Amino acid sequence: MRYRILIAACLLPLGLHAQAQDLPDNLDFSLDGIGISNDLFAPDEDNTPAWLQPFTFRLSQQLIAQSNPHSISLADGSRAEKNAYVENHRSSLLLRYQNPFAPGWLLQASGQVKLYWPGDYEYRANRDHIDTEFRLNEFFLQRSEGNSSVKLGAQTVVWGENIGNSVLDVINTSEFRDLTIIDIEDARLNQWMLVWERFYGNHQWSSFVNLYPEFNPPPVRGSPFFFEPAFNLTDYRRDKALFEAGTQMRWSLTGSDISVMAAYLYENQLHYSAPPSGMGNALSEAGDYLLLGVSANRAIGRLLLNLDIAYSHDILVDVMMANGSDTGTVAVRKLGGTAGFEYAIDNEQNLLLGVTAETLLKTDEALAPGQRLLVDRHTGNALLRYSNSLRNGDLLLSVTMQSALDAASVLGSVALQYTLSNHLSLTTQAIATRADNDSALAPLDGDLRLGMTLSWTF
């Protein structure tokens, strides 16, 4: 019954529809006598064919290496040597298309083609052969009229005020394939959805429906996050129709925004367990749950304060069964919050901080006798970002720090992007990681990655 009420709420918006001084009459502004061509200050002629004008292309070449030889601790207590090696050696072509082809209509799409060269982990995973990949990112058609807008296609929906680590940013799936992608903005995967928005004075109502929910893809073989699973991880077998739906109401007040939201979602991460026979493909389980949230911000001069709160009902967590050998899942409730701020130091410098904490509620009531949790009851992380635009915007410094609240794992990144011309840019980056032995990032402890990316936009 609660899901029917939520869907009805999502569908409701579809039915709502200086004074000039006098100059002498004989004043002559002619340039004929000083030899200046009439078209000297004319804008450059655009020779781009009309059919190509909606397109933007970016061709990039990337090289990144783990450059710190060191040893790491293994699960059995021993240590293993880790040599320096090339991790990413790839070329990519990013294509963007944006065409407002008629009043109130917009067609937008983007896709990427990648080639993996010798040295890249994708090359090694492909048995030392050059590999290729194509991915369609976004592809949607938007219709806007009056105070309403409808979008249909592959797109993202982002909830929450905090950028980068909000507890409400859970609608789209994500893929952190390697350490070149450390920001959620770059890791989000588009999903096929219908999204509509309607504006009423100082407030906005937006809703979405997803008739084919997808799940986070497993780590790519050879990537820094890959581990050899005990059983083969296959795609989720859909034995019934799945859907997601959500709605959000947002009020804009003087210096503040407040939003309330509700959604019926599937967890982005599948839960895996051993097959009954002990051989073959792992069993995958998708958990559906109800999300209730509230978010707010407050602007005070150059400071913007953000707060997001999420309550999740019937989230699945992994447990060890009473027999001590089998694993399973139980449904629990979870409460989480993200508090942070954005501060504009000046016109060139910005600072962002967000802290997230989540806790499982009354787990003892959900666990059967003899069962125990295989996950932490309390988790949290912090995100710090600093950016500085130098040399009239030609040089951009970006610093990122991510850490678990207990400092069990820490990642730091420093990037410099230098604009060589209107079309050419060079980005250099250093990424360092530290992790405790019992952390999921323990294999990355002590790593130092150095790299560069050369990009040509046309």
Q: What are these regions, as identified by a protein language model?
A:
Residues 265, 297-402:
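Detector for outer-membrane/organellar transmembrane beta-barrel domains
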Residues 176, 432, 444-458:
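Outer-membrane beta-barrel "beta-signal"
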Residues 61-69, 113-117, 145, 156-158, ...:
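Transmembrane beta-strands of outer-membrane beta-barrel pores
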Residues 98, 103-223, 254, 433-435:
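Outer membrane beta-barrel
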Residues 55, 103-107, 147-150, 202-205, ...:
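Repeated loop/turn-to-beta-strand initiation elements of outer-membrane beta-barrel proteins
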Residues 93-99, 138-143, 194-198, 247-251, ...:
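Residues on the lipid-exposed face of transmembrane beta-strands in outer-membrane beta-barrel proteins
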Residues 85-91, 132-137, 144, 188-192, ...:
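Residues that define the transmembrane beta-barrel architecture of outer-membrane proteins
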Residues 18-86, 92, 96, 100-103, ...:
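N-terminal periplasmic/intermembrane-space "pro-region" immediately following the signal or transit peptide
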